């Protein structure tokens, strides 16, 4: 009887251990990115980067889980690498139509035009079939703000950059989906305490330490293969000309690659304008803040969980006498 009890207890302990192991799921990807910027009568630059992203998800209970992302990077052209670092670590709770997030979490604005990165803070979302409402608040460091370019094609130096200090980030967004083919989103992004008063992309200084960007975006699906997306946003703070304080994007997309579907593909064409003070960290790999122009690209699934991307940009700096710029960008992602 005693031996039987010990076996029973051992079985319970093993079962508990298995349950805990099952509570943590690991996923991620390895991605390789290569790109080249080519300025007319200006400096060219290239990127040749390998990146590993690990994404564990731990279930806490019926309502809560914890997500994290751990990144490591290597630069293939110089044979150097960076230290592995924590990019995301946030708790996520689900209660009916409500989702609550807190920690170092990913935040994306409509279509990723203004922001697609992480920050330290919290987010509350309400979503049903027709409406999604979202409120975000937190702190955003200067490292989140993507580099801008001067009119000669040179990156702004540290003392010339628009955002000189960690700021307070707030966002509110409301999405309405009247049908399965159409959705429209209105949003407002407010960032304060940036020490950006002296930023001068041309001759006039910005004159404010705050960014206040309102934006409207919409998506329309003509059928299962063709989608048209549009966005317009404007920063109402500061004293710069409107070309620096506004952004807009129009994109036509055909199909799309799925990592689970070998042979699937997608194509797109777009025109975008990303004013220096109207965006923070856009989602795009080709066009960059302070540029405007045309972009075309495509994606293809070579095998299950292996997807390749390529894009080409042709445009110019937004500043007067802005230098013409072209950029080729490519990426391959191995999901696991």
Residue ranges and their predicted role:
Residues 33-45, 78-81, 94, 162-164, ...:
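Outer-membrane beta-barrel pore domains
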Residues 148-161:
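Intrinsically disordered, low-complexity Ser/Thr- and acidic-rich flexible linkers and loops
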């Amino acid at each position: 009887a005693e031996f039987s009890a010990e076996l029973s207890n051992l079985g319970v302990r093993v079962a508990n251990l298995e349950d805990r192991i099952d509570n943590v799921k690991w996923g991620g990807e390895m991605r390789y990115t290569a790109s080249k910027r080519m300025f007319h009568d200006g400096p060219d630059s290239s990127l040749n980067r390998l990146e590993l992203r690990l994404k564990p998800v731990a279930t806490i209970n019926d309502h809560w889980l914890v997500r994290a992302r751990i990144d490591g990077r290597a630069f293939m052209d110089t044979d150097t690498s960076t230290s592995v670092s924590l990019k995301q670590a946030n708790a996520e709770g689900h209660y009916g139509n409500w989702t609550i997030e807190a920690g170092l979490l990913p935040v994306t604005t409509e279509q990723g035009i203004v922001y697609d990165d992480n920050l330290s803070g919290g987010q509350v979302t309400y979503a049903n079939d027709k409406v999604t409402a979202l409120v975000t608040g937190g702190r955003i460091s200067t490292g989140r703000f993507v580099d801008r370019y001067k009119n000669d094609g040179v990156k702004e130096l540290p003392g010339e950059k628009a955002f000189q200090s960690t700021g307070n980030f707030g966002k509110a967004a409301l999405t309405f989906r009247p049908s399965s083919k159409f959705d429209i989103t209105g949003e407002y992004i407010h960032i304060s305490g940036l020490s950006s008063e002296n930023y001068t992309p041309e001759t006039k200084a910005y004159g404010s330490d705050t960014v206040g960007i309102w934006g409207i975006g919409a998506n329309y699906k003509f059928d299962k293969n063709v989608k048209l997306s549009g966005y317009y946003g404007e920063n109402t703070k500061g004293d710069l000309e409107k070309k620096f304080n506004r952004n807009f994007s129009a994109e036509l997309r055909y199909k799309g690659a799925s990592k689970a579907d070998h042979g699937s593909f997608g194509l797109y064409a777009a025109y975008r304008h990303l004013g220096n003070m109207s965006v923070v960290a856009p989602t795009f790999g080709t066009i960059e803040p302070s540029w405007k122009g045309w972009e075309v690209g495509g994606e293809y699934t070579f095998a299950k969980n292996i997807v390749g991307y390529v894009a080409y940009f042709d445009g110019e700096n937004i500043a007067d006498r802005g230098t013409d710029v072209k950029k080729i960008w490519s990426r391959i992602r191995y999901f696991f």
